[in-house]
Design a protein with these regions (language model features):
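Extended alpha-helical assembly domains of large eukaryotic scaffold proteins
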Residues: 1-168
């Protein structure tokens, strides 16, 4: 379930990921053929061969999922470019997905010097793009990008860049 309890996801036994939207209203036929208002909707969006999903803890429009050996971040059910990963998803906060390399831990637990080396962090595309904009284009263009993709982490980057440039 997402952070504001408006959407729900489930992976069935065949690895098919389905989404439900609790805010949508639709009509459902009853026994006598009349239709009635129904709260909630099974969304058409589906993904196949999914084995893990995690919703962002601070943005109800974001979730991350593992499909085969690729990590996808979905914003409003639209996928960003995938990243190769073998990690098991454990946290999605501030546009960063954390995954644990459990297969590596189980394969040779004696060789692990520190558990932190088994935790991998992936940044969402909007976070990577904002960092790129701040180094390659004007602050004004970066602000326009963040206005289209609002998130408190992105606004924090803008604020830090403004302070660095003394442009506020």
């Amino acid at each position: 379930m997402n952070c504001d309890s408006t959407k729900f996801s489930i992976i069935d036994i065949n690895g098919v990921l389905s989404f439900y939207d609790f805010e949508s209203t639709g009509t459902a036929g009853n026994v006598r053929g009349a239709s009635s208002q129904m709260k909630g909707e099974h969304l058409v969006t589906e993904r196949k061969e999914v084995w893990s999903i995690i919703w962002s803890s601070d943005n109800p429009k974001l979730c991350a999922l593992m499909e085969k050996n690729r990590l996808y971040v979905l914003r409003d059910f639209q996928p960003e470019e995938p990243v190769l990963s073998a990690g098991y998803l454990c946290d999605f906060t501030d546009l960063e997905v954390k995954a644990v390399l459990l297969d590596d831990i189980l394969k040779d637990p004696e060789e692990i010097k520190s558990i932190t080396e088994m935790i991998v962090e992936y940044e969402a595309k909007s976070l990577r793009d904002t960092r790129d904009f701040l180094t390659t284009v004007s602050l004004k263009d970066a602000v326009e990008f963040v206005e289209k993709n609002p998130h408190r982490r992105l606004w924090k980057l803008i604020a830090e860049a403004s302070l660095d440039k003394l442009n506020f």
